[in-house]
Design a protein with these regions (language model features):
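N-terminal Rossmann-like NAD(P)+-binding subdomain of aldehyde/semialdehyde dehydrogenases
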Residues: 1-114
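Short acidic-hydrophobic, aromatic-tinged amphipathic segments that line or gate anion-handling sites
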Residues: 3-7, 173-178
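Generic short N-terminal amphipathic or hydrophobic helices
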Residues: 26, 41, 59, 145, ...
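Short acidic/polar active-site loop segments enriched in Thr and Asp
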Residues: 35, 114, 144, 172, ...
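Conserved small-residue-rich beta-alpha loop and adjacent elements
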Residues: 99-164
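Short basic, glycine-rich beta-strand/loop surfaces that mediate nucleic-acid
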Residues: 162-168, 179
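Low-acidity, Ser/Thr- and Arg-rich intrinsically disordered low-complexity segments
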Residues: 169-175, 182-196
């Protein structure tokens, strides 16, 4: 049976998802081919960010100095509690195996993943709790390589509080805007990641 419309809405920028999907597919394809160079070009275009893709130890230390001591103390308190709970929770999980019927064996085996990519919403608003909850719990779970990724706020880069929160456990902190799909998923892969807000 054919659809009959009483009234058909006109397509607008908000409702015409088809063209948006085509644009996003093109961006992702460009990033996949051009990697860091293209992602930085796209970040400059959309995010107005022209800084480094990977934050250096000096940039991380600089960010720390921009945060009031009271906020740092509160973040340490939260981090410690998140870590304590995550470790206690991990302690309640165990490998198990059982035979449901003769010859039908089932069970679970806990195997930590080798790498985790933690997206932290950022841009104009700092989501400090997202940084702590994702990065800290990954560390407690035994993940060896943790990458934290957050969008910049223009040329200011990542909010200093997000950098500080993620730096407690992440191996790399990153700051570029166009494509989270570029985030490395294993150690020693190309070291670049990005996200869009």
């Amino acid at each position: 049976m054919a659809r009959v419309y009483l009234k058909k809405a006109e397509k607008t920028a908000k409702t015409d998802a088809g063209s948006t999907q085509d644009i996003v597919r093109g961006i992702l394809s460009d990033i996949e081919e051009g990697r860091e160079k293209v992602a930085l070009e796209i970040s400059a275009k959309f995010d107005k960010y022209s800084g480094n893709a990977i934050l250096s130890r000096d940039e991380i230390d600089e960010a720390k100095e921009k945060i009031p001591q009271k906020l740092r103390d509160d973040m340490h308190y939260a981090h410690d509690n998140i870590m304590r709970f995550a470790l206690a929770q991990k302690g309640t999980m165990s490998n198990m195996e059982m035979e449901l019927h003769p010859g039908l064996i089932t069970g679970q085996k806990l195997i930590p993943v080798n790498a985790a990519g933690c997206y932290v919403p950022g841009g104009r608003y700092a989501h400090i709790a997202s940084a702590m909850m994702t990065v800290t719990t990954a560390k407690a779970a035994g993940v060896g390589h943790i990458t934290a990724c957050s969008p910049p706020n223009g040329d200011e880069g990542i909010n200093p509080a997000i950098i500080y929160a993620a730096s407690a456990s992440a191996n790399i902190r990153l700051s570029v805007g166009p494509a989270i799909m570029s985030m490395p998923t294993r150690p020693n892969s190309w070291r670049f990641a990005s996200a869009t807000n």
